[in-house]
């Protein structure tokens, strides 16, 4: 690239120099990302009205087999702390633990420090195995159903410009409760609150909704049925819950035969994680209607005498469900499909899966560098598109 050659006096830096640059200046990449967003705002390219939240996973620099158990960790800690160890227990260690034991380019103090770090991760996560090469990475489920040692990459993207507004790397294996953190980061980077924040169904929970309400941001998060309906994947069984229509005024479900199942009970289901809000379960049925319904055998399984609909969610979730039934919000939410491109570019052109980075902080710094490069290219392209459009318009008027 001509600019690169000019700045570097036509000298290509070594890979070691590039790695050192990334290591020493990593904490500045997000600041530079903020500058690209400010430039877009100052140029009038966007006002950040609609920011879309999404998540993906990035494979860590650690194979699935290169992990160590809690028992093996304790054996090695005892060994390096000088406690008596049965030689047979050392011989029975699995290969990753054996490799650590036999590692020649690492002194005992460094090995012990690594093992202490692994012990901390066991306490912090509750997992039964910890990756040895990247102890902060976690086993996560990929889109193909396979598990891999990875990081959860959360992103926020502006609809108008497709610029990346924020990146947040986490250890959580799912996206459920990630919206507040990535949204807060995006607001800090764009220096304003967007009118809309959209997200997939997996983000629909009390924590996300409370955050959006507190920030007075118009959230756009469909429920599972609305998402399935949008892509035409409702359950083919005509008597499945997907085909029971909820009446918000009556607080009742209308069944395919035209009868209403009314609310009759609410239960609080404690969350497994005490720091997360309890789940609210609402039950609906109509025993008399089901008793005399000619379609009961098609709708209910053989032991059932009547149909019961179970619905999860608070009043805030009901309000979100009702809002997402309105066409104006469906149209606004439909825009998010066009902002899912950056990570496709990351994986195909930037080859982020091949990047050798270890640790959560360093992974986030590297993804921020990728996001910075993406935003700079995107800004250039936006400016070129505007200039070309202006030239075409001038040529048309002159002709």
Walk through the language-model features, giving the residues of each.
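Anion-binding and metal-coordination hotspots
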Residues: 6-399
């Amino acid at each position: 690239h001509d600019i690169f050659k000019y700045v570097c006096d036509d000298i290509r830096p070594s890979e070691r120099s590039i790695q050192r640059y990334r290591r020493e200046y990593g904490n500045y990449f997000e600041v530079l990302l903020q500058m690209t967003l400010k430039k877009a705002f100052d140029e009038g390219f966007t006002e950040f009205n609609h920011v879309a939240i999404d998540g993906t996973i990035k494979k860590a620099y650690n194979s699935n087999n290169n992990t160590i158990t809690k028992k093996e960790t304790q054996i090695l800690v005892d060994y390096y702390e000088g406690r008596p160890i049965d030689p047979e227990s050392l011989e029975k260690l699995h290969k990753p633990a054996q490799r650590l034991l036999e590692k020649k380019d690492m002194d005992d103090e460094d090995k012990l420090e690594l093992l202490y770090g692994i012990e901390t991760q066991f306490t912090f996560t509750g997992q039964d195995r910890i990756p040895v090469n990247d102890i902060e990475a976690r086993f996560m489920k990929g889109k193909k159903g396979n598990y891999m040692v990875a990081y959860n990459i959360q992103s926020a993207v502006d609809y108008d410009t497709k610029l990346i507004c924020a990146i947040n790397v986490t250890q959580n294996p799912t996206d459920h409760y990630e919206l507040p953190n990535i949204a807060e980061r995006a607001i800090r980077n764009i220096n304003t609150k967007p009118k809309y924040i959209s997200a997939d169904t997996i983000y629909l929970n009390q924590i996300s909704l409370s955050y959006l309400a507190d920030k007075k941001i118009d959230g756009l998060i469909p429920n599972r049925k609305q998402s399935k309906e949008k892509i035409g994947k409702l359950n083919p069984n005509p008597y499945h819950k997907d085909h029971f229509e909820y009446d918000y005024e009556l607080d009742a479900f209308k069944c395919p035969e035209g009868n209403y199942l009314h609310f009759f009970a609410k239960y609080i289901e404690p969350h497994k994680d005490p720091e997360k809000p309890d789940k609210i379960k609402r039950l609906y049925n109509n025993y008399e209607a089901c008793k005399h319904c000619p379609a009961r055998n098609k709708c209910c399984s053989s032991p059932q005498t009547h149909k019961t609909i179970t619905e999860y969610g608070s009043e805030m979730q009901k309000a979100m469900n009702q809002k997402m039934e309105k066409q104006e919000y469906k149209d606004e939410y439909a825009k998010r499909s066009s902002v899912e491109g950056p990570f496709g570019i990351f994986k195909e052109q930037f080859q982020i899966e091949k990047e050798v980075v270890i640790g959560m902080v360093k992974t986030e710094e590297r993804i921020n560098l990728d996001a910075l490069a993406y935003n700079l290219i995107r800004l250039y392209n936006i400016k070129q598109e505007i200039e070309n459009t202006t030239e075409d318009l001038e040529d048309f008027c002159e002709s």
